[in-house]
Amino acid sequence: MARSIRTATIRQRVTISAPPDEVYCALTNARQHAAFTESEATGSGRVGARFTAWDGYIHGKHLVLEMPRRIVQEWSTTEWPSGAAPSRLEIRLEPKGTGTLLVMVHAGVPAAQAASLRQGWKDYYWSPLRAWFASKGRGRTKT
């Protein structure tokens, strides 16, 4: 019998100074993902395709891809406890002025890793993504 692992849900909202289609591509295109995270990413932007990010630390599968407004992934890290099921990551992208409101719900995260992942999303995704778009002349963003 598999052991029960307590899980948590992480919710975050971020405003990014780029249109939803560009944010969507940055999150689903391996080349763009690697560019803004400055780490290796693999995979294709197709439903059912497997992907890796952060030099293989993150791995998963695209479950739903609705360009340019919704991304749903099965998602795990190499530090997931043995026997833990993949989490479910959902990102919704909504136009907000000339930018995008990104709404993330990351459910089924092992509770012991929730605080680290909550901060990790900010430090390793949202900040670099905002900086990457700013370097492309997109301006500043808010969290």
Go through each PLM region and give its residues:
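Hydrophobic-ligand binding "helix-grip"
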Residues: A34-T42, T52, G56-G108
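Generic anion/oxyanion-binding catalytic loop in active/binding sites
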Residues: R11-Q12, E22, F51, H106, ...
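Alpha-helical scaffold segments that form or flank carboxylate-/histidine-based iron centers
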Residues: R11, A18, A49-W54, S116
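A conserved amphipathic terminal alpha-helix motif
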Residues: I5, G108-T143
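Hydrophobic ligand-binding cavity/cleft-lining segments
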Residues: M1-T42
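Short, hydrophobic secondary-structure boundary micro-motifs
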Residues: A35-F36, G45, R140-K142
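Tryptophan-centric aromatic hotspots in well-structured domains and transmembrane helices
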Residues: L27, E74-W75, W121, W126
